[in-house]
UniProtKB/Swiss-Prot annotation:
Name of protein: Uroporphyrinogen decarboxylase
UniProt-listed GO biological process terms: protoporphyrinogen IX biosynthetic process from glutamate
InterPro entries, alphabetized: UROD/MetE-like_sf, Uroporphyrinogen_deCO2ase_HemE, Uroporphyrinogen_deCOase
Location within or outside the cell: Cytoplasm
Ligand binding (substrate): 27-31, 77, 154, 209, 327
Catalytic activity line of the entry: uroporphyrinogen III + 4 H(+) = coproporphyrinogen III + 4 CO2
One Pfam family here: URO-D
Protein task: Catalyzes the decarboxylation of four acetate groups of uroporphyrinogen-III to yield coproporphyrinogen-III.
UniProt entry keywords in alphabetical sequence: Cytoplasm, Decarboxylase, Lyase, Porphyrin biosynthesis
Amino acid sequence: MTALKNDRFLRALLKQPVDVTPVWMMRQAGRYLPEYRASRAKAGDFMSLCMNPQFACEVTLQPLDRYPLDAAILFSDILTIPDAMGLGLYFETGEGPRFKKVISTPADIEALPIPDPQKDLGYVMDAVSTIRRELNGRVPLIGFSGSPWTLATYMVEGGSSKDFRKTKAMAYDNPQALHLLLDKLAQSVTSYLNGQILAGAQAVQIFDTWGGNLSAAAYQEFSLAYMRKIVSGLIREHEGRKVPVILFTKNGGLWLESIAEAGADALGLDWTCEIGDARRRVGDRVALQGNMDPTVLYAKPEAIRQEVARILASYGQGTGHVFNLGHGITPEVDPEHAGVFINAVHELSAQYHQ
């Protein structure tokens, strides 16, 4: 494989020295970009975009052609695993993701297969290798998956949910059944991420979007325990380099100390945490990724720069920080404002890496 021309993202995750703070954005390939909207129209719909490696590669690279980002992230969806388990993922306009089949009984869980990354999710592996080839060493490629708890909520609720009542009821009424589901998902996520690493992903992130909706005890039992299990089964070195792992629990700021013990290299932070406090709490155990409120991008350019400066100052001197938003960039953001954000990170962070 081609040598990396820009490896500061990987270096920061491993707490190695960098010249400036690296930056990328969750959902950086997305609807805020007119070129993404054109590709999606050409593909026909969201799933066709995900399932065609050429289209997935095209949209993954679009933000890199526009901005000096320090990493690319695979364009895909977190629900590819439940879809490969036979649940029939589809998207309703204005409704978000839905499943044709819903998991409601222990028998449903028993019947679920563990997908084979090559056979059942080959289109994702093909996308990873295509993107990696097209990147030609420009920046590292991030692979990703949803966390077992987050995937389970969609499978049990049948789609998005405000209160996760069916999944939480299962946690209290029939924890054995939920543990079986989470265990199958942990096995599936481990082999899926390892497949992405072997196909060319140079770092991986686990998105625990809904872990922060659990009580402290339930988070430990039903979310963190399974992420820990995944991390322990991941390929951590490939092509002569370490493959860093990032865990991101949205609204997980209360539990940073225990997440830092899960074995990952970095923790993603949402914008409700103060990054300087988070750094003091986790010490030197892990790098931190985040954590500007995505809606700051609706403000004027000078306000965006001020918030970038504030977050950089809060983190302070030295490496171990990957700048990102605290969640995905939203569709109505002006692409010019995203550019202001990215340039500000590089420009204003050099003083912290003397």
